[in-house]
Amino acid sequence: MGTYAVDGADLVFKPRFAIPPDVACRAIAAGKEFPFAAAARERKSTTRVTQVFPSAAEIPANQLKFYLEFSAPMEKGQAWERIRLLNAEGKVVELAFLEIDQELWDRESKRLTLLFDPGRIKRGVMPRDQVGSALLAGQSYTLVVDREYRDAEGNPLVSEFRRVFRVRAEDRDPVEPTRWSFQLPKAGTREPLRVAFSEPLDAALATRLIGIDGMTGTLSLADAESTLVFTPSANWEQREYKLLVDTALEDLAGNRVGRPFDVDTFNRITVRTNRGVVAVPFRVR
């Protein structure tokens, strides 16, 4: 796969992905074959892991996912070979993550979502009963990304990445926006609105599923994803506003607004919970 272009008397093919030096190739034109091999390239290590979410030093024992962010697009199909979770003794936690064939990358191939096996999180499910939870409260773990994890150009990372975190008790409580606290701006200014959550939230979802009714601006997270910072593009007026929260918003354990992640999977569901929006009013003076 790639694109073609005419450069004078030459026909130039630009491959979508870099051709490894050890792969034999051939060009076919006018019924003739022209074998060739890509020239060996100097391996330049410039790509690194830039961030891991959640960024807090402590996570719940029923943590649902990690987000790994890289500084450049990455080659797919390496995650389960190059990423591992170690316990406090330095031993690999076997099958901690849900090792699916289709890795969960964003469109730029720079952010990878690692899901913990839900079967080891939900109570009353066979994997948890037989194997146990991947994370144990009170223990420390290390997330390791091998240096040999290749970027889209085939180059390894600048260095191995390690992130140590401690595990606290499981979180089975739903997200409750009505319990959040507001640090309000002054009318006539563009001071940021700060909203302190009652717990850290899913970083990717929080920046997409929270907004201010009728307002535009920039939204970011602070304090290890436990605080929302909204800076408006226009001055605040002296009136009531509404913080809009999509009920698909999740905390670190996958609990949603008004709905815990750990529902009873064996009881028949008689009430359907529709996705909606919770509006939390606040007044600027």
PLM regions and their residue ranges:
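Acidic, low-complexity Ser/Thr/Gly/Pro-rich repeat segments typical of extracellular/periplasmic
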Residues: 1-285
